[in-house]
UniProtKB/Swiss-Prot annotation:
Alphabetized UniProt keyword annotations: Oxidoreductase, Pyridoxal phosphate
Function: The glycine cleavage system catalyzes the degradation of glycine. The P protein binds the alpha-amino group of glycine through its pyridoxal phosphate cofactor; CO(2) is released and the remaining methylamine moiety is then transferred to the lipoamide cofactor of the H protein.
Stated name of the protein: Glycine dehydrogenase (decarboxylating)
Organism name: Synechocystis sp. (strain ATCC 27184 / PCC 6803 / Kazusa)
Single GO term (MF): pyridoxal phosphate binding
């Protein structure tokens, strides 16, 4: 009989998906990350638009952004995800990384981050959302932590001065080369690098040396005869293969030939080994990664740089120094800033802006928590385990090819056995380092246990049953250093390293320091050109996942599939956002991005036989890193004028381009301009440069005004760096970390930074890459997850809306303040971009009030000042970002208006011109209640100048700091701070 049952229709997966979408539309709306990221809600946006005279946000954007550069379509990116959904997807990607025990070394080690440090610094917005401590009175906590860092480095290295961190060990070594080149009395043009330095450091050195015309000689320090004149030398201590050498003889010979010597030294080893300063080294560099900082597939980590006092004014990077405030109390500040790029520009010691403050703070607190005894015990334990491992390997008939070592063994295994040993190790979840054929390296760290040694012995034995027990071998364990390389000098004797060893004490110390700093968890930080937007918690959470944090940067590619997926997606997304054909994620700071981009342009010209192209045109308004980076690339800087409206003077640009013709290499331009406007002539500007054979480098500092509205590659840029720590939500960390990846058009793609150390000499000869510009192939890889999360959660519409609201907020503030402070520059239809410049010069003329007075008075209102006196002296540049609510914008505007009124009171003779709230700001709690109050204004006017300060008061920790005194009496260690306190 026929089957009369109705046929069952099975819906297709596509049909089910459509039904689910329809059902989803009927449900109450899900939580939107965009609503969490934006400060002003829809109602507040309408109020702001009404103030500006616009009906819709689209109307404002149409008037503000030049039509010629508008992006004609929506960004083609994945749809936005919820916080929960994005975390789940990223967790799935992370799971594709394989977390092995990596004993590869090369300056990177697994480590133990003390939970009290992870929870209260790395995961604490009170630390990671602060800005570089230019406004020192409200950054005393961070500055003290950095002073601890400097002291720790000076003590461990035995040198007289240290900076507050650099980007990584490789670039720190390159900076040492540059310093040596600048101060050496030798007329030589060659720099010697020992062949047993870390290979990535050698690569970075070569990259840096090339455009400066420096010859890099890589050789054996044992046999180098100094018959070739050199200005400096770099040695690894201990060497990359683990060997510990006494470098005294080499250093003495170098000094006889007027060359400076840099030791790249592992700071943990220096608790046991004679420090570089005592060996005679002029400079010491290295990484503090193993002081509690996760591997993170290469970063971020805080490098250090220490040298002799005579070179302090030539040293790169930030230096924290001790000074005193207006009341005579000790106070900390950034010292010797006249060395730096934001002042010295093309004559600066380096293009480094900020570095790795958050990581330096963590490393310093690792030192504080453990103290000298704790650090020495960690080092001694690692060394003892290494010696124990060596004894066992000898019992297994393997040769050890170094006489002395700290934590790394160079094991002779034979060429035929090496592949099997490496494979056996991999089978047990262990990474070893292949050295020369027939040798492997094993580098131990503080996470290693005796069980790990058993696993290693079994790898080399080829079986589980060993002919010995660890206990049997212990009696043979002895220190493996000669007496003259065993440290005798004391270190970390200052009180701070000897009183916070319980978690309770350290927790309170960290809280005390944090409470002295104003970060985004207190109030807005409206710094122009800095984009201090929300760093959402969901974006930050994955940074500490072990699937990202415990991966060695030179782990086998098969173990890093998750990272490769992350990189590929992020590169594709950034390419779509900017219009560029290729992205390099290697630059680990904006300054590094600038350097990489200009190097790419230089290499492109060289590949075409146009080596004469060395002129870099830079607008007078440009950030100081621009000319500093150009000089580092061997270019000659030629400034271009700006017109009265703050735009690039097209006539002057044309004249300069014609003048230099076939010598023109590049134009560096920021867009929107550093004056806070969309220049309508940007397309014409790019065309002029291209007409004369130059390339256009765009500084991406102001990309937050472009995302979704226009794309730099579309209107003429050939290369651009992106500040992921601005536009794409990586936090500033109080002065780092940052990331500065670059995007390029297809004709420049071949010249991007190299990501492999394993290419042969033949391949490198064919390779057109500029080489490595950071020590790790993907820079500070672990924080790229932050930008991935931001883009994934915002989606294409959300990213565009964020840009629009950032422009709305800036124009709203400009409108509210224009009757009190002239808005110096405006663009299309009298509108600004995402920031605006307030002209404070009338206050100086009328009431003798300086920009500094306003900046310090804002602290009494609970605000960090906008960018001061840049790009125009006597002004403030304000950038509110899209993340600040209307209430917060109004509070800041009210504070600025109140300050204007205080200045007017001086002008009208109502307040003493010398003794007033502006000149005496900031006001500390101590200054209000200790001693007599002899000022002609009340304590309430001083400390509670606005209603919101009575609801919550942020107190500056010190009064106004005497900057001149600090530079004239330079003290850069805790010892100096203690002396001040005693005095």
């Amino acid at each position: 009989m026929p089957n009369l049952e109705p046929a069952v229709v099975v819906p297709t997966s596509e049909a089910i998906a459509v039904d689910l979408t329809k059902l989803e539309e009927k449900l109450a709306p899900a939580d939107s990350f965009l609503d969490r990221h934006l400060g002003p809600g829809e109602t507040e946006q309408r109020q702001m638009l009404q103030t500006l005279g616009f009906d819709t946000l689209g109307d404002l954007i149409d008037q503000a952004v030049p039509p010629a550069i508008r992006f004609p379509r929506s960004l083609q990116l994945p749809a936005s995800q919820s916080e929960y959904g994005a975390i789940a997807q990223l967790k799935s990607i992370a799971s594709k990384n394989q977390v092995f025990r990596s004993y590869i070394g090369m300056g990177y080690y697994d480590t133990i981050t003390p939970p009290v440090i992870q929870r209260n610094i790395l995961e604490n917005p009170g630390w990671y959302t602060a800005y570089t401590p230019y406004q020192a009175e409200i950054a005393q906590g961070r500055l003290e932590a950095l002073l601890n860092f400097q002291t720790m480095v000076m003590d461990l290295t035995g040198l007289e001065i240290a900076n507050a961190s650099l980007l990584d060990e490789g670039t720190a070594a390159a900076e040492a080369m540059a310093l040596s080149y600048g101060v050496s009395k030798s007329k030589a043009n060659a720099f010697f690098v020992a062949q047993d330095c870390h290979p990535q450091t050698i690569e970075v050195i070569k990259t840096r040396a090339n455009p400066l015309g420096i010859e890099v000689i890589v050789g054996d320090h044992h046999t180098f005869s100094f018959s070739t004149s050199i200005f400096g030398a770099l040695l690894q201590y201990p060497a990359t293969d683990g060997a510990v050498y006494d470098y005294r003889s080499f250093i003495d010979k170098a000094h006889q030939h007027q060359a400076l010597v840099t030791l790249a030294a592992d700071p943990l080893s220096l608790t046991l080994l004679t420090p570089p300063g005592e060996l005679g080294a002029d400079i010491a560099v290295g990484s503090t990664q193993r002081f509690g900082i996760p591997l993170g597939y290469g970063g971020p980590h805080a490098a250090y740089f220490a040298t002799k006092a005579e070179y302090q004014r030539k040293m790169p990077g930030r230096i924290v120094g001790v000074s005193k405030d207006a009341h005579g109390n000790p106070a900390l500040r950034l010292a010797l800033q006249t060395r730096e790029q934001h002042i010295r520009r093309d004559k600066a010691t380096s293009n480094i802006c900020t570095a790795q403050v958050l990581l330096a703070v963590m490393a310093s607190m690792y030192g504080v928590y453990h103290g000298s005894t704790g650090l020495k015990n960690i080092a001694l334990r690692i060394h003892q385990l290494t010696v124990l491992l060596a004894i066992g390997l000898k019992r297994l008939n393997y040769s050890l090819n170094n006489d002395y070592f700290f934590d790394t063994l160079r094991v002779g295994v034979g060429e035929q056995s090496a592949p099997a040993i490496l494979k056996a190790a991999e089978g047990r979840g262990i990474n070893l380092r292949p050295l020369v054929p027939g040798e492997v390296g094993i580098s131990l760290d503080e996470t290693v246990t005796v069980q790990d040694l058993l696993d290693l012995w079994q790898v080399f034995a080829g079986k589980d049953n060993l002919p010995f027990t660890p206990e049997e071998l212990w009696s043979e364990v002895k220190t493996s250093f000669p007496a003259d390389l065993t440290r005798q000098s004391l270190y970390l004797q200052d009180a701070v390293f000897n009183q916070y060893h319980s978690e309770t004490e350290l927790l309170r110390y960290l809280h005390q320091l944090e409470s002295k700093d104003l970060a985004l968890n207190t109030s807005m930080i409206p710094l122009g050109s800095c984009t201090m937007k929300l760093n959402a918690t969901a974006e930050m959470m994955p940074v500490t996942w072990p699937e990202f944090g415990k991966i060695h940067p030179f782990a086998p590619a098969g173990q890093t599939e998750g990272y490769q997926i992350l990189f590929a997606q992020l590169e594709a997304w950034l390419g779509e956002i900017t219009g560029f054909d290729a992205i390099s994620l290697q630059p680990n700071a904006g300054s590094q991005g600038e350097y990489a981009g200009l190097q790419v342009i230089r290499q492109y010209h060289l590949s075409r036989g146009e080596e004469q192209r060395n002129i870099c045109l830079i607008p007078e308004s440009a950030h100081g890193t621009n000319p500093a980076s150009a000089v580092m690339c061997g270019m000659q800087v030629v400034p271009v004028k700006c017109d009265g409206e703050g735009n690039i003077d097209v006539e002057d640009l044309t004249s300069k381009a014609e003048k230099y013709g076939d010598r023109l290499a590049a134009l560096m331009v920021t867009y929107p301009s550093t004056h806070g406007v969309f220049e309508a002539t940007i397309g014409t500007i790019c065309d002029i440069v291209h007409r004369f054979g130059g390339e256009v480098y765009m500084d991406g500092a102001n990309m937050n005004a472009q995302v979704g509205l226009c794309r730099p590659a579309d209107f003429g840029a050939d290369v651009c760096h992106l500040n992921l720590h601005k536009t794409f939500c990586i936090p500033h960390g109080g002065g780092g970390p940052g990331m500065g990846p670059i995007g390029v058009k297809s004709h420049l793609q071949a010249f991007l930074p190299r990501t492999s150390l394993n290419s042969t000499a033949e391949l490198q000869a064919e390779d057109q890459s500029i080489g490595m510009i950071s020590a790790a192939p993907y820079g500070s890889a672990s924080i790229l997850v932050i930008s991935w999360m931001y883009i994934a959660m915002m989606g294409p519409q959300g990213l565009t809306k964020a840009t629009e609201v950032a422009i709305l907020s800036a124009n709203y503030m400009a409108k509210r303040l224009e009757n009190y402070y002239p808005i110096l520059f405006r663009g299309n239809n009298e509108l600004v971009a995402h920031e605006c410049i307030l002209d404070l010069r009338p206050l100086k003329k009328q009431a003798a009030i300086e920009v500094e007075d306003v900046a310090k008075r804002l602290m009494d209102f609970g605000f960090h000042a906008p960018t001061v006196s840049w790009p125009v002296l006597g002004t403030m540049m304000v950038e509110p970002t899209e993340s600040e609510s209307l209430g917060e914008l109004d509070r800041f505007c009210d504070a600025m208006i109140a300050i204007y009124q205080e200045a007017q009171a001086i002008t009208h003779g109502e307040i003493d011109p010398a003794d007033n709230p502006l000149k005496n700001a900031p006001h500390t709690a101590q200054s209000l209640i200790c001693g007599e109050w002899n000022h002609p204004y009340s304590q309430e006017e001083a400390a509670y100048p606005a209603p919101w300060t009575k609801q919550f008061k942020f107190w500056p920790a010190v009064g106004r700091i005497n900057n001149t005194y600090g530079d004239r009496h330079l003290v850069c260690s805790c010892e100096g701070m203690e002396a001040y306190k005693e005095g």
